[in-house]
Amino acid sequence: MKNKLITFKNNNFTALVIYLENINFKYFKKFLLKKIQKSPIFFKNIPIALNIEKLAFNFNWINLKKFFFSIGLFLIGIFGCKKESVKLDILKSGLPILFKKKKTLLNFNKKKNFFNKNSNKNHYSSLFIKNQKSYLVNELIRSGQRIYAPNTDLIITNNVSPGAELIADGNIHIYGNMKGRALAGAHGDETRKIFCTKLSAELISIAGEYCTVDQIPIKFLENSVEISLVNKKIFIKYNH
């Protein structure tokens, strides 16, 4: 019996979706570059899709593709296009047309449990949380998972595996072993903090300023700490 070396299967992946409305290409470039400058780590290696359902301007799709490539972003495709002529222009540029499915949207209902206990632990996924005072996650955060809490605090009451990523515009609280990456103040708020009961993080960041595991003083590793930003530098102290 021959082994199957290549298998084709359907699968779903999540990505950061940018919604374009009444905006021209020049302004879009300026806006996106400003966002990246504020939160460079957040945008690093993240797949991006564009929703042009309400786009009033006609873009030069070849130039758009070149722009994304020049700044190191991964544009995986475009969806929401209604005009066949525009679809054809997009395809000619080498960009794929994506088709949206309800279960692949990034806006999850907060009453539903995003984490499936029976899911494959190697499944790569992202969770984008609607605005609320704070967001609580009790499940283990597995490698490859990314959780983003816009305009709020993120609270984790379990362990965070290596390769997992926590992002919040507010503070981040981790009541478990933190082995992944934590990025607080993602939109530039320098007053935000990271609280961790057991620090073993690959990377910690506040308002774009970051510190890797190699830069974290050994005395703070495996300890309960409070992380803040002082004079644009990461400051760590024991949290007793």
UniProtKB/Swiss-Prot annotation:
InterPro entries in alphabetical order: CAP/MinC_C (IPR016098), MinC (IPR013033), MinC_C_sf (IPR036145), MinC_N (IPR007874), Septum_form_inhib_MinC_C (IPR005526)
Keyword Secreted: no
Record keyword Cell cycle present: yes
Keywords: Cell cycle, Cell division, Septation
BP terms from Gene Ontology: cell morphogenesis; division septum assembly; regulation of cell division; regulation of cell septum assembly
Family from the record: Belongs to the MinC family.
Chain's role: Cell division inhibitor that blocks the formation of polar Z ring septums. Rapidly oscillates between the poles of the cell to destabilize FtsZ filaments that have formed before they mature into polar Z rings. Prevents FtsZ polymerization.
Complex formation: Interacts with MinD and FtsZ.
Name this polypeptide is given: Probable septum site-determining protein MinC
The species this protein was found in: Buchnera aphidicola subsp. Cinara cedri (strain Cc)
Gene designation: minC
